[in-house]
């Protein structure tokens, strides 16, 4: 059995803040990631689900408000900014849960004056693998083609399984100081460890949620999110050959819609290890339990896992002192 807790939300409901006055005063000044680590809050099932990610190279610094598109502080032309803003509106109108994320241009990966955009969608019929299209906005029709896909419905033609792994590390210090301080440090260490390897690209990115779990990382094509990473975790994370040493850093798969599914998939990841990325998983969520089938080469397993929800409690969600309720969830 393992306990999990939800990601930060705007405070609501009747969750009780059980901290003493001295603890609350201390928490107003301590970094949010330090508080979260000290509290023992587990990370499983804290990944916000999305249908689509739109990754766009945009020079930092980015806006300090997560609701403001990252390109609004760039030196881009009004035409480019307007097209991307219309893509956001188009995705919303199509009912697509799309997350637009800035990538800091990289000396090794990027083309000066020709920003890259990568669009990722959940693979149809595969809940933890993402397919992709890639565009260059400075090329003829590149901007229009990218925005048509980014702002359109799901399931368009042109998506393929990519050969390049994209590892995003949040370094958005304008939103949260823990993300800036810890994310930049982890990104630097990961880039040094990889050297000239271009089969994995490690990016500094804008906010992807879960500031108190900084440094946070999002890994594609698996769509797996990680938190509280340290430099000693990088050999395991980058090689992907084992899971156990960093399993307690796992936040969940952003392609799964419910916290119950994320908690169950996390338990399956612990049991099956890295091979789970190639599995076909089918979930059926009922009141109080989840049925799941696991199909791998030579393996056809079925499980029923019980879901236990605990009482909400308050946590410090970010370095600005915002508090929000989280609800523990266990599976067995």
PLM regions with names:
Residues 2-3, 7-332:
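Histidine/cysteine-enriched polar flanking segments
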């Amino acid at each position: 059995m393992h306990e999990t807790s939800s990601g930060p939300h705007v405070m609501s409901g009747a969750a009780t803040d059980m901290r003493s006055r001295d603890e609350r005063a201390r928490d107003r000044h301590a970094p949010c990631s330090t508080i979260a680590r000290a509290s023992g809050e587990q990370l499983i099932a804290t990944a916000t689900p999305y249908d689509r990610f739109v990754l766009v190279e945009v020079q930092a610094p980015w806006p300090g408000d997560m609701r403001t598109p990252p390109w609004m502080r760039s030196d881009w032309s009004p035409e480019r900014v307007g097209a991307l803003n219309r893509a956001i509106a188009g995705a919303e109108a199509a009912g697509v849960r799309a997350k637009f994320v800035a990538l800091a241009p990289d000396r090794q990966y990027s083309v000066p004056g020709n920003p890259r955009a990568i669009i990722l969608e959940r693979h149809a019929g595969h809940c933890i693998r993402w397919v992709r299209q890639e565009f260059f906005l400075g090329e003829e029709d590149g901007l229009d083609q990218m925005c048509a896909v980014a702002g359109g419905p799901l399931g368009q033609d042109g998506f393929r399984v990519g050969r390049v792994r994209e590892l995003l590390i949040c370094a958005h210090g304008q939103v949260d100081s823990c993300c800036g301080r810890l994310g930049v440090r982890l990104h630097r260490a990961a880039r040094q460890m990889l050297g000239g390897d271009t089969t994995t690209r490690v990016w500094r990115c804008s906010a992807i949620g879960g500031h108190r779990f900084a440094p946070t990382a999002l890994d594609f094509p698996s769509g797996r999110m990680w938190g509280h990473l340290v430099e000693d975790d990088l050999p395991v994370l980058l090689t992907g050959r084992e899971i156990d040493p960093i399993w307690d850093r796992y936040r969940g798969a952003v392609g799964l819609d419910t916290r119950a599914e994320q908690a169950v998939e996390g338990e399956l990841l612990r049991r099956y290890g890295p091979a789970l990325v190639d599995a076909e998983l089918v979930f059926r969520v009922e009141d109080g339990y989840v049925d799941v089938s696991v199909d791998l080469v030579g393996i056809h397993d079925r499980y029923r896992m019980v879901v236990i929800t605990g009482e909400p409690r308050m946590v410090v969600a970010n370095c600005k002192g915002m508090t929000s309720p989280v609800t523990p969830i266990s599976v067995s």
